């Protein structure tokens, strides 16, 4: 996902401070009932082959997302009643109900625009090599040694290129956390998203910045037809829950975790700015 944010850009984007701001959209108008969002695209946005980015590219991207049926395929359709492009510069999204986090959805890579000609030409091979896609983000892919390295270079025609300081990014593809950490500590890497849990307190103690994603960890029971009949007893599941020493798990991790009592973790707020965890009913008293 981090790589995609460099190669492509949605109606919204994450700025230098990881705050959501307008990306390919120059402006947005929200109706009084907060159900209709009308985006006007920037005049200076192009694909890496020089063609202008159009509203239809976004509509095609939305449609293609739903048609693929993969991860996040309903991330937009869950909240959107419809979407359309009345002209090349306008994207209109109508919601089923007000959705304060729509900007977050539209900044997520799954809702980025897509060029129909490239998707149809390459099919399942689309975007598997640098020349099998075009890019509307700040960088374009220069090379991709599969399972080894991706090299990206800054696009001179990106609308905000003058404010980007890094001309080339090398992404090393590593699966071993210990190898990634060793390369980071030696200075070969300036950033890594892999770090063994047991090393995280030490890294923070050295003054380095470590950020944890919004994750929940839980035990899930199969209550379907093929599931264990014993586990379908609510009291059995509660008993198993009581055997989990949550405080001990947090102490072992040594991070700023908190006991999870909801499926949605802390950090998600409603339209009034109230955190969901603070106003929803917890599953169970875990004390």
Say what each PLM segment does.
Residues 1-32, 63, 134:
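N-terminal lobe/hinge region of extracytoplasmic solute-binding protein
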Residues 42, 153-157, 214-239, 243, ...:
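A bilobed periplasmic-binding-protein/Venus flytrap-type ligand-binding module shared by bacterial periplasmic
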Residues 77, 200-212:
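Ligand-binding "clamshell"
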Residues 107-164, 168:
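Gly/Pro-rich hinge or "lid" segments in bacterial periplasmic/extracellular proteins
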Residues 26-69, 86, 92, 183, ...:
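Aromatic- and charge-enriched surface segment that lines or borders ligand/interaction sites
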Residues 257-287:
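Structural transition elements
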Residues 29, 33, 40, 74-119, ...:
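Surface-exposed binding/hinge segments that line
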Residues 156-202:
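Ligand-site clamp/hinge motif
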């Amino acid at each position: 996902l981090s790589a995609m944010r460099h190669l492509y850009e949605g109606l919204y984007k994450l700025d230098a401070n990881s705050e959501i701001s307008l990306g390919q959209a120059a402006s947005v108008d929200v109706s009084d009932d907060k159900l209709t969002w009308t985006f006007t695209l920037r005049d200076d946005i192009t694909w890496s082959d020089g063609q202008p980015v159009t509203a239809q590219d976004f509509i095609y991207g939305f449609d293609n997302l739903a048609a693929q049926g993969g991860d996040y395929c309903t991330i937009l359709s869950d909240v959107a009643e419809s979407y359309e492009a009345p002209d090349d510069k306008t994207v209109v999204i109508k919601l089923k109900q007000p959705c304060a986090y729509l900007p977050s959805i539209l900044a997520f890579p799954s809702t980025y625009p897509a060029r129909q000609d490239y998707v149809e030409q390459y099919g399942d091979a689309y975007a598997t090599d640098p020349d099998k896609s075009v890019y509307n983000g700040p960088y374009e892919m220069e090379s991709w040694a599969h399972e080894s390295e991706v090299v990206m270079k800054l696009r001179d025609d990106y609308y905000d290129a003058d404010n980007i300081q890094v001309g080339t990014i090398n992404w090393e593809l590593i699966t071993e956390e210990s190898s990634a950490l060793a390369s980071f500590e030696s200075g070969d890497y300036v950033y890594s998203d892999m770090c063994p849990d047991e090393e995280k307190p030490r890294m923070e103690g050295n003054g380095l910045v470590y950020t944890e994603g919004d994750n929940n960890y839980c035990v899930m029971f199969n209550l379907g037809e093929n599931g264990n009949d014993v586990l379908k007893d609510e009291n059995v599941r509660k008993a198993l829950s009581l055997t989990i020493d949550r405080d001990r798990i947090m102490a072992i991790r040594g991070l700023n975790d908190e006991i999870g009592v909801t499926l949605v973790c802390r950090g998600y707020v409603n339209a009034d700015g109230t955190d969901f965890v603070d106003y929803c009913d917890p599953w169970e008293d875990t004390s």
